[in-house]
A protein has these predicted regions:
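Flexible, glycine-rich active-site loops centered on histidine and acidic residues
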Residues: 18-35, 96-122
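Structural motif
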Residues: 58, 90, 120-122
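Active-site nucleophile and cofactor-binding loops and adjacent substrate-binding regions
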Residues: 89-97
Length: 122
């Protein structure tokens, strides 16, 4: 890909530049956590239909407006609702989790959804 193509987004997309999205699962005013998680699934499906390579989920705790505290659970839910997009954690905060539990959870997810699960650590 030449320098000219790097400056042209349309050209870059046609050259298969991998794009990813980071989902915070923000709860909008008036929505429930369930609605927010359903929106996250719809967002991932839409990203997949547009050819995005990866869908990252952020981990946040003790925040009423963010519904992605149980990242591995949400990753499994979204991977099960999509077909090909990679799904991963945009930073599992290891000080908050026993490392063995994280390894087992993500190993299980990888077994269920081969070559589609990514583990980001923070």
């Amino acid at each position: 890909m030449g320098a000219r193509c790097l400056l042209d987004l349309e050209c870059a997309v046609t050259k298969s530049v991998p794009f990813s999205l980071l989902e915070l699962a923000s709860v909008r005013e008036g929505d429930t956590v369930g609605e927010t998680l359903a929106n996250s699934v719809a967002y991932a499906r839409h990203a997949e239909s547009l050819g995005f390579q990866r869908f990252w989920l952020a981990e946040h705790h003790n925040m009423q407006g963010i519904s992605s505290a149980a990242t591995s659970v949400l990753i499994g839910h979204i991977a099960g609702a999509t077909e090909s997009i990679r799904v991963g954690s945009g930073g599992v905060m290891l000080p908050n989790h026993p490392p063995l539990v994280i390894a087992e959870q993500f190993g299980t997810l990888e077994s269920l959804y081969p070559d589609r699960i990514d583990l980001g650590l923070g």
